[in-house]
Amino acid sequence: MTSIRATTAVFAALVLITTSTGTAAASTDPHREAVQRQLTAAVASGAAGVQIRVTRDGRQFTARAGVAKLGSPQSVPLNGRFRVGSITKTFATTVTLQLVGEGRIGLDDPVSRHLPGLLPDGDRITVRNLLQHTSGLHNYTDDIPRDPKEFLPRRFDHHTALGTVRKAAAKPLLFPVGTKSSYSNTNFLVVQLLIEKVTGRSWRAEAHRRILGPLRLTDTEVPGDNPFILGPHARGYLVVEGKPVDVSALNPSMAGAAGEIISTTADLDRFHLALLEGRLLAPAQQAELTRTTAVSPGYGLGYFKMTSSCGITLWGHTGGIPGYLSVMLSSANGSHRLESSLTTGTALDQQVLTKVVDSAVCG
């Protein structure tokens, strides 16, 4: 990997693989043993450390492999904190859909209704287009330096959602609004601005008020400008001139509602189960969450689906931010769930990681 952009690119190519990184305690359970074997293989293929939480048919276990810090014998904390990257989008979508249910914003409202003048095409781009990645907006993370030597000295810079969106919106649309799908982090910075405009409070405050507080996600944080991961955590790395460099500390304001959240596998599992069980959204908005279209067949609203090798359809999100790859996936009924974090500074073997996912989901 060569930068935040490269991190995202690698993760996109390995969507399923991250799903299964973790280790299990010694056990005669064949499922746990299968997961452990694949975790060991993931570390052998380049991961510094991995942790995973797996739930299947009411039985749950946690597992890990590798180390929390290169050069140290310390194991990855089993419920250590990590940067979840784009899993943040599912949190932001949940807040937005709650506002839709309250009648404060509409999915088919044009952005210009709430944020006049922000986007040149704001009369045509709707809230739904943003959540579905069909807006055509330029992806601002494509402009982040590819070379980690350029990224490293900038990683503590402060960024505002408004400033970042304005720069991205100055570039031409990738396609006419609604005609195609293209993943763009810019969409969710606009979502952040919408949440703040409609509520009069920060996106951070709304996430705490609506999700983190009610669900008691005490190990989950919307950090803003705080560059540090508080509490036990594994270090994340980028490779610079062939050597891993610790990038655990960085200013997550560059990610905002597109990817700034810090959490744990336990908190992500609690959040995802609440979402699946309809405890966070009204039925109408719950249905919208997983509604796909011909233009965006694999992505609902801040939420995507994939199919495991054993035919189980999974919903959730993955995330990539410098130093960390993460995953949160579940079957529609919640019987099969997994949350995982992987720390690495190298490209990993896709087949190895795909096997990890399959071991966790299919066993």
Identify the meaning behind each predicted range:
Residues 122-314, 318:
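Short, surface-exposed loop or secondary-structure junction motifs
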Residues 31, 35, 84, 88, ...:
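Hydrophobic (often cysteine-bearing) scaffold residues that line and stabilize catalytic clefts
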Residues 2-4, 25-64, 199, 245-363:
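Catalytic loop of the DD-peptidase/beta-lactamase superfamily, centered on the K-T-G motif
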Residues 55-77, 81:
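N-terminal, post-signal-peptide region of Sec/Tat-exported proteins
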Residues 1-27:
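Secretory targeting and sorting signals
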Residues 57, 68-70, 135-136, 227, ...:
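Solvent-exposed coil/turn segments that connect beta secondary-structure elements
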Residues 46, 71-129, 175-184, 256-259:
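Short active-site loop at a secondary-structure junction
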Residues 39, 58, 92, 96, ...:
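Residue-level preference for non-acidic, small/hydrophobic
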